Amino acid sequence: MENLANRLDACQDKILELYERDSDKLEDQITHWYLMRVESALYYKARECGMTRIGHQVVPTLSVAKAKACSAIEMHVALQQLQQSAYGKEPWTLRDTSREMWDAVPKRCWKKRGVTVEVRYDGDETKAMCHVLWKDIIVQNLSDDQWVKVKGQVSYEGLYYVHEDVKVFYVKFHKDARVYGETGIWEVHVGGKVIHHNAFDPVSSTQEVPATGPLYASHNTTRSPTQAPLGPEEGQERKRRRLEAVGPGPQQQQQQQHQQQQQQQTPTHTPSTQACARTGGPVDSNRTRDCDSTSQNPYRHPSDPDCAPVIHLRGDPNSLKCFRYRLQNGKKGLYCKASSTWRWSCEPENQSAFVTIWYTSVTQRAEFLANVKIPPGMQAILGHMSVF
């Protein structure tokens, strides 16, 4: 017990030295989180041995010590990866590498140079909310785990950044409009400038992906006064592009269902399409198979509004968990939700496991496959599932 107390005192003394030094070197911040790991491990071991106090310090429970240790390990590993990037030589303070900063939106990435953005709902100062716009956001690529720096931006819709040609919103102003406002209109005040509702243009050359949830199909939009009136052909073309972006409407779905029923009455199955309707194929760098796009199986209707496009990832359980974790941190806007790891009950535990990923539309699923690299040794089986 005395040896454990001495080690804990030495560890905490080094932590206090780092606090007093207030260094801006990344090496010192890595050392800080390493010492936090050691401290939590010592607490865990002491509690495991039945100790409730070490000197005058209360030993936390096993669950608390374990949670703090896991948090410190995550921060320590993330900082080690950051040190190997091109931004390892930049100034990094304890505040920049704190857990609170890591968990602040956008979560699980490094942020610097924050600017306050005030959103006034209904144009009333008493109905204002403040958010932080990070000018520098360092996010991790999903394909090669490299850290890259992107610029934080603001629009009438919210706060976002563009990573790998995908616009990722981490704050959406319309959510607070339902709580604080009545008209659904707001003003964005940032850096002495004001962004009004009539300055919002829903048509953009950059592809937009919401931070979470399905694609937002309805927005109260107004054409900017600076835009010239569209002719009939241009207006129809822009309307068609918007409809394609949000997926088929109810009338289109009914037409697709009617066509599907007609095709079922006159089936023309070939051996290859029948086999494809029963099984899914792996998705790799050389080929992509979507069985539902060619199958006439009456139990699968891609146009059925009660069915959602999915991808069943099959592989090693640990690899699936790691891949799902990376998706949640870096590509959450490219899918709707992901399941936990599961298996068929008739298979032994040493067999491959599955993770099912849901999408709001086939377009979103295709965008996911175009932007996300499936790890080697992992199969992606495309299909549809009933919505529940």
UniProtKB/Swiss-Prot annotation:
Domain of life: Viruses
Main location: host cell
Region Disordered: start-end pairs: 204-308
Keyword Transcription regulation: yes
Positions with biased composition (Low complexity): 251-265
Annotated Polar residues bias: 218-227, 266-276
Cellular compartment(s): Host nucleus
Keywords: Activator, DNA replication, DNA-binding, Early protein, Host nucleus, Phosphoprotein, Repressor, Transcription, Transcription regulation
InterPro entries: E2/EBNA1_C_sf, Nucleotide-bd_a/b_plait_sf, Papillomavirus_E2_C, PPV_E2_N, Reg_prot_E2, Regulatory_protein_E2_N, Regulatory_protein_E2_N_1, Regulatory_protein_E2_N_2
Gene Ontology BP, a term: regulation of DNA replication
Entry-linked SUPFAM superfamilies: E2 regulatory, transactivation domain, Viral DNA-binding domain
Subunit relationships: Binds DNA as homodimer. Interacts with protein E1; this interaction greatly increases E1 DNA-binding activity. Interacts with protein L1; this interaction enhances E2-dependent replication and transcription activation. Interacts with protein L2; this interaction inhibits E2 transcriptional activity but not DNA replication function E2. Interacts with protein E7; this interaction inhibits E7 oncogenic activity. Interacts with host TAF1; this interaction modulates E2-dependent transcriptional regulation. Interacts with host BRD4; this interaction mediates E2 transcriptional activation function.
Family: Belongs to the papillomaviridae E2 protein family.
The protein, known as: Regulatory protein E2
Lineage: Viruses, Monodnaviria, Shotokuvirae, Cossaviricota, Papovaviricetes
